[in-house]
């Protein structure tokens, strides 16, 4: 057994100059000269042993630098030693290297006449999805107009979409999509993108030279080392994935003139785009793409994965969804292989730079890239309704990214080498990838638990095959969707308790708490067992457990709000930060709560009068909780999410409906005169006098009655709750029945009773869905169930499993990159702090009233520049 190599006792600098080395982490000689102190591994002494097998392998790997230009014919798949003729112009020099591999992948996924069958399970499913999409494209109208998306905006969308799509698979509530109304982001962009080729003609090599047609031989010749360094600073400060590249190692390679020029070109192109110099950025990008033909197809290293991932990220935000999918898929294939190798043989124990193990830094970059790829794969497969469990290597899901600077060897190396200028944005990138990994783990496990859709066997079928089909069907049935939702929610509640204890000691993560609370509310209302998007309220049963869990969720959300507000305000300068994501998850939870209250009202209609009397006190507790949640919109923090108007509108509509039910019960004399309000304790953890440091108004304002006239004390409803709510102007938001559907409104007429009539609901876009009577007068759940949002057709199911060892290892995991949309970062709710908020008289909740003032005479807080 070969002895493991050890680090030298003297650093490289002292050894080359033959001076005494102190042997410290940073020796005295290097510290006095302010240079890096590098300790290499000891070289084995004596004559090396000759291994015939190793020698043979070395001779094979030491072949020609590039693949031989053999044109691929008759649908023969390309490999590392072949090339392929471009589909754009057959007269162009045949493509080689990575460029040829990407061309093959594009034809397999999107070619009208595929040159070969898909080479792996991932591409087979992508190709199948694209064929189904193309078949339905002709019958569908245009979805979201094409446009561009900012880099941080797409990262924020990725995290929100993962949470929304997986809850849509299980829950019956629906949600306001973060992306906006219409198709989901991935499907919408795939419908728009009809690109026929993987590469533009300008990127292809010309027949006479190896340079791209119309391109420069070496575009980087215009950049000296100082200019390159400055552009790298810009890139590190602005790219949300800056944590996948080590700044210290890259600058070290740049000084030694060994840096990969293609990677530099891609990063410089992004830097020019950040500086609004698109012309130079596009030229650099074309040159970088053209150089892919010089990278051998079998060179599956970290640098190649970084190049293709960054190219895919650029293309998805520019609207080239097909090309982005191929770039990211190729990067995912390399990254998964590197991560698997890393799991078997760690890279640690190699060269040390200022005391930091270089192998550990490279391993961390691989793990960061792997989680980005896995997130993109899970995100796209959920929207494609394709099974995913067999593509997830179980052992790779056990290592989560670092969260803080002390835990990150990459950032520790930057500190040790005094590369400090971009540490803050790099830390933000690190925390974003950390959060993305947690969202991905939750979504992947829940999606894998989704019951399989049992299809009928094809006819005719031999009796032997029919028997096997029936037996396999029994094997796959597993647990019901209701049981899966219940078990999953119990697991989430256990995690929530742990996080809340950590938060009490200042170590909790409010963003994850907001995510788990949002998902747990959705899991309270499982979808129909058949998997069809039919409202399940006709069979849903009210229970004491349901009310208790909803009340507990309200308490948790109220207690979490100060932390969410503080983190969102602290991280407002970083648009893709965990603070911004936490705010969006919190809005998702509030949206789910408002829909849950409406769901309870829908079920309430069909229960007997005896049951209604039993649950009245619980319903009053939900009313108090809903009003308390509505009060939170007084604070500026929630107004950074573009969905705040719609969520607020749904909350007050739900509270108005509950109030009408309770008022009607009182008028009919069916309500008990008990003075108990509910078993809910709403003594939440918001300070009675918010401090200016929290960004919350410090004036104590009396609260006007919300939506309804003051009830007598016999009702058991508190007449006032400490709050300060700004009024909002009347604006049409997303309607309740179908997110994004804008319905006509009409002026609200005078009330003739305490029941909310259809005219009362006109301001909330609900009038067309409510009969001329009040909400509580509906005799069956069908009328009110029309208010609830429905989802798109039934998704494909997956095998049930929860524990990681049940994931099947796969050798090739290819991630996918989504297409873009017309929205910008501001449209995603990043930094949306503008537009004045007019007052609304909350006593009747009719929008358009005159501005109100606080109890102490101070003018209520307004937001400027808020766009709808």
Curated annotation (Swiss-Prot):
Compositional bias ranges of the Low complexity kind: 663-683, 715-727
GO MF annotation, one: DNA-binding transcription factor activity, RNA polymerase II-specific
Compartments it resides in: Nucleus
GO CC entries: nucleus
Residue span of region Disordered: 51-88, 662-683, 715-761, 829-868
Residue range(s) of DNA binding per entry: 11-37
Keyword terms: DNA-binding, Metal-binding, Nucleus, Transcription, Transcription regulation, Zinc
Superkingdom of the source species: Eukaryota
Gene3D superfamilies attached to this UniProt entry: Zn(2)-C6 fungal-type DNA-binding domain
InterPro entries: TF_fung (IPR050815), Zn2-C6_fun-type_DNA-bd_sf (IPR036864), Zn2Cys6_DnaBD (IPR001138)
Gene Ontology BP annotations: positive regulation of metabolic process; secondary metabolic process
General function of this protein: Transcription factor that regulates the expression of the gene cluster that mediates the biosynthesis of pyranonigrins, a family of antioxidative compounds.
Protein name: Transcription factor pynR
Gene source species: Aspergillus niger (strain ATCC MYA-4892 / CBS 513.88 / FGSC A1513)
Organism taxonomic ancestry: Eukaryota, Fungi, Dikarya, Ascomycota, Pezizomycotina
């Amino acid at each position: 057994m070969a002895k493991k190599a050890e680090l030298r006792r003297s650093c490289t600098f002292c050894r080359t100059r033959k001076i005494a080395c102190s042997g410290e982490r940073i020796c005295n000689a290097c510290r006095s000269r302010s240079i890096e102190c590098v300790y290499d591994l000891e070289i084995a002494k004596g004559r090396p042993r000759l291994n015939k097998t190793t020698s043979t392998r070395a001779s094979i790997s030491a072949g020609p630098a590039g693949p031989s230009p053999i044109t691929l014919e008759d649908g023969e798949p390309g490999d590392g030693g072949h090339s392929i003729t471009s589909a754009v112009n057959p007269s162009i020099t045949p493509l080689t290297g990575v460029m040829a591999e990407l061309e093959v992948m594009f034809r397999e996924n999107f070619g009208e006449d595929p040159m070969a069958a898909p080479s792996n399970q991932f591409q087979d499913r992508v190709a199948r999805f694209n064929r189904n999409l193309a078949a339905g494209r002709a019958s569908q109208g245009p979805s979201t107009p094409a446009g561009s998306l900012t880099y941080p905006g797409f990262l924020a969308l990725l995290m929100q979409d993962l949470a929304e799509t997986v809850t849509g698979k299980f829950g019956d509530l629906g949600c306001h999509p973060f992306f906006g109304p219409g198709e989901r982001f991935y499907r919408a962009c795939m419908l728009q993108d009809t690109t026929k080729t993987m590469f533009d003609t300008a990127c292809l090599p010309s027949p006479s030279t190896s340079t791209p047609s119309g391109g420069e031989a070496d575009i980087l010749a215009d950049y000296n080392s100082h200019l390159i360094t400055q552009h790298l600073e810009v890139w590190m400060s602005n790219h949300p994935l800056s944590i996948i590249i080590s700044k210290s190692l890259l600058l070290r390679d740049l000084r030694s003139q060994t840096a990969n020029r293609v990677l530099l070109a891609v990063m410089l192109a992004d830097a020019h785009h950040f500086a609004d110099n698109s012309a130079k950025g596009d030229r650099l990008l074309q040159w970088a793409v053209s150089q892919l033909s010089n990278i051998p197809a079998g060179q599956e290293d970290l640098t190649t994965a970084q190049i293709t991932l960054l190219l895919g990220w650029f293309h998805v935000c520019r609207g080239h969804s097909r090309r982005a999918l191929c770039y990211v898929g190729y990067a995912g294939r390399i990254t998964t292989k590197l991560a698997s190798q890393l799991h078997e043989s760690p890279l640690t124990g190699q060269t040390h730079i200022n005391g930091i193990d270089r192998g550990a830094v490279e391993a961390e970059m691989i793990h960061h890239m792997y989680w980005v790829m896995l997130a993109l794969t899970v995100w796209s497969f959920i929207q494609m309704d394709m099974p995913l469990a067999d593509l997830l290597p179980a052992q790779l899901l056990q290592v989560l990214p670092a969260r803080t600077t002390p835990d990150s060897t990459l950032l520790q190396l930057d500190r040790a080498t005094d590369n400090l200028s971009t540490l803050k944005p790099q830390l933000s990138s690190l925390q974003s990838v950390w959060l993305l990994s947690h969202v991905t783990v939750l979504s992947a496990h829940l999606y894998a638990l989704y019951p399989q859709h049992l299809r009928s066997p094809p006819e005719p079928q031999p009796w032997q095959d029919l028997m096997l089909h029936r037996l396999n069907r029994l094997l796959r049935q597993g647990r019901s969707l209701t049981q899966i939702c219940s078990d999953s929610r119990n697991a989430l509640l256990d995690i929530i308790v742990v996080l809340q204890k950590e938060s009490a000691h200042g170590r909790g993560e409010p963003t994850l708490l907001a995510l788990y609370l949002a998902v747990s509310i959705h899991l309270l209302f499982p979808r129909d067992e058949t998997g069809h998007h039919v409202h399940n309220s006709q069979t849903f049963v009210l229970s004491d457990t349901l009310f208790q869990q909803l009340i507990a969720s309200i308490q948790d959300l109220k207690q979490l709000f100060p932390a969410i507000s503080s983190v969102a305000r602290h991280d407002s300068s970083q648009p893709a930060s965990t603070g911004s994501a936490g705010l969006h998850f919190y809005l998702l939870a509030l949206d789910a709560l408002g829909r849950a209250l409406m769901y309870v009202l829908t079920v309430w209609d069909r229960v007997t009068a005896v049951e209604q009397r039993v649950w009245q006190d619980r319903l009053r507790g939900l009313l108090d909780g809903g009003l308390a949640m509505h009060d939170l919109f007084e604070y500026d923090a929630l107004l950074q999410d573009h969905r705040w108007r719609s969520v607020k509108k749904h909350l007050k509509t739900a509270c108005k409906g509950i109030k009408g039910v309770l008022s009607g019960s009182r008028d009919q004399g069916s309500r008990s005169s008990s003075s108990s309000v509910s078993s809910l304790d709403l003594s939440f953890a918001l300070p009675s006098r918010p401090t200016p440091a929290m960004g919350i108004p410090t004036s104590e304002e009396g609260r006007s009655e919300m939506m309804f006239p003051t009830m007598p004390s016999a009702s058991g409803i508190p007449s006032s709750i400490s709050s300060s709510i700004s009024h909002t102007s009347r604006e049409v938001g997303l309607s309740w029945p179908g997110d994004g559907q804008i319905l006509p409104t009409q002026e609200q007429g005078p009330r003739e009773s305490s029941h909310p009539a259809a005219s009362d609901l006109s301001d909330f876009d609900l009038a067309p869905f409510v009969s001329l009577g009040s909400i509580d007068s509906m005799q069956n759940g069908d009328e009110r169930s029309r208010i609830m949002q429905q989802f798109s057709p039934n998704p494909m199911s997956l095998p049930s499993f929860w524990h990681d060892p049940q994931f099947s290892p796969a050798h090739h995991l290819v991630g996918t990159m989504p297409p873009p949309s017309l929205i910008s970062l501001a449209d995603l709710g990043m930094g949306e702090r503008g537009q004045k908020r007019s007052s609304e008289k909350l006593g009747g909740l009719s929008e358009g009233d005159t501005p109100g003032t606080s109890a102490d005479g101070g003018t209520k807080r307004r937001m400027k520049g808020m766009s709808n």
